[in-house]
């Protein structure tokens, strides 16, 4: 049972009509990231599937774990914020190991949690801002 106050429907009545346009814009930004960063062997981007396009609430790349912190520090020095939205794999969360008493080893998930970096992505991100971000990513890996 969920009860909504009157403010939530008012907010949704404004936001929902914009959902498709905002999602389309994020998809366009993600496609542009893919194009601009496609020649970099030093990063991995997630696969894109034609029959199931992402909504790109995040745009996550993977870099080697040994350079991730330095890479993020470099981008921050250029005014580019990044995130690590999934820093711990499910198999290593305390709820999994301590409370559920599940002992499982998921090497790929654990590796991914050490390599992921989320780049800025939001519908208002301009081409100029995205060019700036990508130029600095490329510069970092060409040094």
Mark where each language-model region is:
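PLP-dependent aminotransferase class I/II
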Residues: 1-143
């Amino acid at each position: 049972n969920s009860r909504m106050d009157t403010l939530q429907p008012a907010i949704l009545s404004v936001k929902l009509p914009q959902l498709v346009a905002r999602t389309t814009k994020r998809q366009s930004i993600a496609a542009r990231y893919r194009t601009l960063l496609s020649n970099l062997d030093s990063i991995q981007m997630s696969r894109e599937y034609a029959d199931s396009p992402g909504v790109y609430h995040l745009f996550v790349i993977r870099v080697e774990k040994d350079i991730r912190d330095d890479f993020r520090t470099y981008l921050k020095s250029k005014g580019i914020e990044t995130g690590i939205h999934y820093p711990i794999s499910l198999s290593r969360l305390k709820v999994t190991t301590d409370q559920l008493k599940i002992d499982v080893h998921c090497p790929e998930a654990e590796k991914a949690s050490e390599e992921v970096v989320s780049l800025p992505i939001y519908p208002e991100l301009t081409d100029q801002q995205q060019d700036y971000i990508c130029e600095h990513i490329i510069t970092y890996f060409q040094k």
